[in-house]
C-alpha cells in the first residue's frame, strides 16, 4: 500500500512537469513557444502582459501579476469544483468514521500479508457500500482542463518580449531570484497546511501530510532553475490558491458538512457487512439451540409416558 502511494505521488509530480512543458511546444531553432495551446491561449496572454507593461506603463512585474490574477479567476470555478468533490469525500469519511475506523485499525495492526489483504478488502467494501470513492473523490477532468492555462501562462511569463530585460522591485525578471523562490515555497506550504483544516479521518490526514512537503518542494526546485518572471507567476498563484482554500474551508465545507449530516439523518448508515474482527458477519445461530433442547426434553417425557 505504501509503495503504491509513493508511486502515485512520484507519478503526479512527473505528470505535472510533463504537462507544464508538454502542452506548449518550443521551437528548437528559435527557442520560442509554438503549437495550438500557445497560439490559442499563450500568445494572447503574452500580448496582455505586453499591453499592461508597455501601453499602460505598469511594468512587466505588475503586468504578470494582473494577467495571472485574471487567468486564475477564469479557472477558479474549476478549482472550486475539484475541491468541492474532494471536500465532499472528506466529509463523508468524517461522518462515517465509526464504520471505517475499525477497518483502518485492523489494517494498521495487521502483521501478515494475508491479514493486510483481508483488512484492505474489508475497508474497500465498507467504502463502496457507503458510496465513498477509494481515489479520494478527485476527478481528472477539472485538473486536465486547468493544465493548458497553467502551461500557457508559464511560457507567457517567460517568453513575452521585453520581460527578460525588465525588473520588478529591484529583482531582475530574466534570472532566478532567491527572494521569490522563498516566497513561493512559504505560500505553497501555507496552502498545504490549510488543506488539513476540517479533515478528521486519520488516513486522509496522513496522505495530506505527505503532500504538505511535496508541493512546496516541487515549486522551490522548479523556481531555482526558472527566471524570476515565472517564479513571480507562481507566487501570485500561491496567493490565489490560499484564497481558494479559504473559500473551501469556510464556505464550501460547512455547507457540505450540513448536507452530509442531513442525508445520513434521513438514511442512517448501517454497519458494514465486514465490521466484525474476522472480517465476516457473525451468523452463528443462538435461538435454534434453545428450541432444540426443548424438543429433546419433550421427546424424553413422551417416551416415559408410553412406557407407563
From Swiss-Prot:
Residues 1-22 form the signal peptide. Residues 263-308 are annotated as: Disordered. Belongs to the OXA1/ALB3/YidC family. Type 2 subfamily. One of its GO terms (biological process) is protein insertion into membrane. The chain crosses the membrane at residues 60-80, 135-155, 168-188, 211-225, 230-252. Its main location: membrane. It is a multi-pass membrane protein. The keyword Transmembrane applies. This is Membrane protein insertase YidC 1. Residues 293-308 have a biased composition (Basic residues). The gene is yidC1. Keywords: Cell membrane, Chaperone, Lipoprotein, Membrane, Palmitate, Protein transport, Signal, Transmembrane, Transmembrane helix, Transport. A lipid is attached at residue 23 (N-palmitoyl cysteine). Pfam families: 60KD_IMP (PF02096). It is found in: Cell membrane. Residues 269-278 have a biased composition (Polar residues). Required for the insertion and/or proper folding and/or complex formation of integral membrane proteins into the membrane. Involved in integration of membrane proteins that insert both dependently and independently of the Sec translocase complex, as well as at least some lipoproteins. One of its GO terms (cellular component) is plasma membrane. InterPro entries: YidC/ALB3/OXA1/COX18 (IPR001708), YidC/Oxa/ALB_C (IPR028055), YidC/YidC1/YidC2_Firmicutes (IPR023060), YidC_ALB_C (IPR047196). A lipid is attached at residue 23 (S-diacylglycerol cysteine).
